């Protein structure tokens, strides 16, 4: 078998084929488990107390409002919010700021963070919903309100029903038609129904979700005429609501779940995608032109809503009550801050215990609060500052403990990955010593990456979840990238093929003494470079996601590298087979004694 090859080529090709098949199998498994751990992600540390609920006495304070309305404008970037005169006018009556949406910047991910106060790595909803919800969400504003028999309402896209439907009392859902002919009208329908229901049924907590602008951005981008027309229509809708009597004596929060890149798309960490507007108006709100002295996080929205309504703070909340935005007395702010701190300290303790650690004394909230109030006496302002300082210190300590646990995992991964890569590199150095062939193989690798990444970046992509615009386009997006990878791989052989014409050797000789040696070396070193890139990701985040999320651009790059490894190895096996058939056809005839004639070899 393979008699047309030299003995060295035959041996090396056998080694490469076995290596390639094993590599394809291993990386297929890696792709399956890595991708699956993201799609089906659930924090394994939090899972033991994921469904716990907060103590309704310790984690809630007296209500300061009868009704609160949260408006989520789907897909509105902070930069585009300035193009809405209705919001500009509303700024004079509200406090507003730019907030950063946590990654991945998907709608369901942001909604869960708004409703639970938990970061995505805690609440676990980091992929599109699909046909049904993967598991019941943790304690959230809707369940907390229900525990106090408060009426809740949602007016928006049907995905809200999938996520929270069983805990919502009043609802109106409007989905898009298959031909998308109702994009402009859908926001108007939702707002009209919301205003009618809120006016007559008076739910304590209402969510108005306007999904139309997001769909327009996906289809046409943010620079087109369609987007401008939709902004004008959206401005009219918001003006109708914000000038109505519904905003009187009610708290109103306006925000967005994410923005869009200019060409349309979200999910990544681009400034236009993560930067959104936060506006708050209502009784006792300190209306200013802008908030420059206070950092507002996305997780702060949930505990602020719960504190205003006087309902329990969700158990996994990691945000803070935005006390500085309100003018009501300090003693009321203190009561609400203590409710949040009671919840957070218990959550921090349970997280550390579940991760196998020992909670530090700083998580003993009651003792710290007692000391703060004792030292401040009746100076409520001093007590408020003391509680804010304690909350920051406890939050920093909690973050440090989580980072410390990840550090030891990274150290372990560093040792075993370094050993594997070092052994692989030592094998390559020992096996392939011919400088000319090494130079040819490395030059081919440079050509391959230059062509592949050149095409990718030329098309305006940047290893972001925003690149493929919508999850529905993910498969077609990846198929196009696979085609580009195959083209880049085939084109990288161009210099090697040109060598065949310049050397003026018989095809048989060139294949045996130039092509196959360089081909084998190229594929081994290409595999090493891809393995090294995958190893860096695994070192940083692990082969599967268990209790933390990666930076999403790194995760997408890792997925691409796995795909490249599998694809290049599979295509290279086909190239090797095709090259051998050509070699066998071009092989010189043997003489009667079984010896090749030198004239036919050369």
Where are these regions (language model features)?
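Alpha-helical transmembrane segments of integral membrane proteins
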Residues: 404-602
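A long, amphipathic alpha-helix that forms part
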Residues: 13, 20-23, 32, 36-39, ...
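Flexible glycine/proline-enriched surface loops and loop-helix/loop-strand junctions
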Residues: 123-127, 222-224, 262, 281-291, ...
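Phosphate/adenylate-binding glycine loop and adjacent helical scaffold
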Residues: 327-419
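Substrate-binding rim/cap in mid-to-C-terminal beta-strand-loop elements of soluble/periplasmic
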Residues: 109-116, 268-313
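Histidine-centered active-site microenvironments of extracellular/periplasmic hydrolases
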Residues: 256-286, 334-336, 464-469
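Active-site-proximal alpha/beta segments of enzymes that process anionic O-linked groups
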Residues: 51, 64-202, 301-303, 307, ...
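N-terminal secretory/membrane-targeting segments
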Residues: 2-66, 584-602
């Amino acid at each position: 078998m393979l008699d047309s090859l030299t003995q060295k080529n035959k041996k090396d090709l056998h080694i490469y084929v076995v290596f390639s098949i094993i590599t394809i199998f291993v990386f297929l498994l890696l792709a399956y488990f890595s991708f699956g751990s993201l799609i089906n992600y659930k924090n394994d540390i939090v899972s033991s107390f994921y469904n716990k609920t907060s103590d309704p006495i310790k984690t809630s304070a007296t209500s300061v409002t009868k009704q609160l309305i949260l408006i989520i404008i789907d897909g509105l970037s902070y930069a585009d919010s300035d193009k809405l005169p209705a919001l500009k006018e509303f700024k004079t009556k509200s406090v507003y700021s730019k907030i950063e949406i946590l990654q991945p910047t998907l709608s369901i991910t942001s909604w869960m963070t708004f409703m639970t106060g938990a970061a995505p790595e805690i609440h676990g909803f980091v992929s599109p919903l699909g046909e049904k919800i993967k598991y019941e969400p943790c304690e959230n504003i809707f369940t907390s309100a229900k525990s106090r028999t408060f009426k809740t309402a949602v007016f928006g896209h049907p995905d809200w029903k999938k996520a929270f439907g069983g805990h919502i009392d009043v609802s109106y859902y409007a989905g898009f038609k298959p031909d998308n002919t109702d994009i402009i009208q859908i926001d108007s329908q939702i707002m009209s129904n919301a205003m009618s229901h809120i006016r007559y049924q008076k739910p304590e907590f209402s969510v108005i979700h306007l999904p139309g602008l997001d769909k327009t951005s996906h289809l046409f981008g943010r620079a087109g005429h369609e987007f401008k027309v939709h902004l004008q229509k959206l401005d009219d809708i918001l003006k109708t609501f914000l000038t109505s009597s519904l905003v009187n004596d009610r708290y109103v929060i306006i925000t967005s779940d994410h923005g869009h890149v200019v060409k349309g798309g979200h999910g990544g960490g681009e400034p236009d995608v993560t930067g959104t507007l936060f506006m708050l108006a209502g009784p006792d709100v300190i209306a200013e032109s802008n908030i420059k002295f206070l950092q507002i996080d996305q997780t702060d929205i949930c505990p602020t809503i719960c504190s205003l309504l006087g309902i329990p703070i969700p158990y996994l909340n990691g945000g803070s009550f935005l006390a500085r935005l309100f003018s009501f007395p300090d003693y009321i702010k203190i009561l609400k801050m203590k409710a949040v701190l009671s919840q957070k300290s218990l959550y921090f303790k349970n997280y550390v215990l579940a991760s196998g650690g020992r909670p530090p004394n700083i998580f003993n909230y009651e003792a710290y609060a007692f000391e703060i109030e004792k030292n401040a006496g009746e100076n409520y302002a001093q007590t408020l500052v003391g509680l804010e300082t304690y909350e920051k210190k406890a939050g920093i300590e909690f973050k440090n403990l989580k980072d410390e646990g990840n550090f030891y995992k990274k150290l372990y991964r560093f040792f075993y990955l370094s050993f594997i890569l070092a052994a692989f590199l030592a094998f390559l150095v020992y096996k392939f010593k011919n400088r000319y062939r090494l130079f040819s193989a490395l030059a081919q690798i440079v050509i391959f990456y230059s062509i592949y990444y050149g095409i990718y970046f030329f098309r305006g992509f940047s290893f972001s979840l925003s690149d493929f615009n919508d999850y529905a386009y993910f498969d077609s997006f990846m198929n196009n990238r696979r085609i580009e990878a195959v083209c880049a791989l085939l084109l990288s052989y161009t210099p090697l093929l040109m060598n065949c014409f310049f050397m003026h050797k018989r095809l048989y000789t060139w294949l045996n003494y130039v092509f196959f040696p360089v081909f084998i070396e190229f594929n081994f070193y290409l595999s090493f470079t891809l393995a090294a890139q995958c190893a860096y990701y695994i070192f940083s985040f692990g082969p599967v996601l268990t209790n933390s999320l990666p930076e999403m651009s790194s995760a997408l790059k890792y997925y691409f590298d796995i795909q490249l490894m599998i694809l290049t190895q599979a295509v290279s096996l086909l190239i090797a087979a095709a090259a051998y058939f050509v070699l066998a056809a071009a092989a010189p005839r043997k003489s009667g004694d079984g010896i090749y004639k030198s004239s036919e070899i050369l």
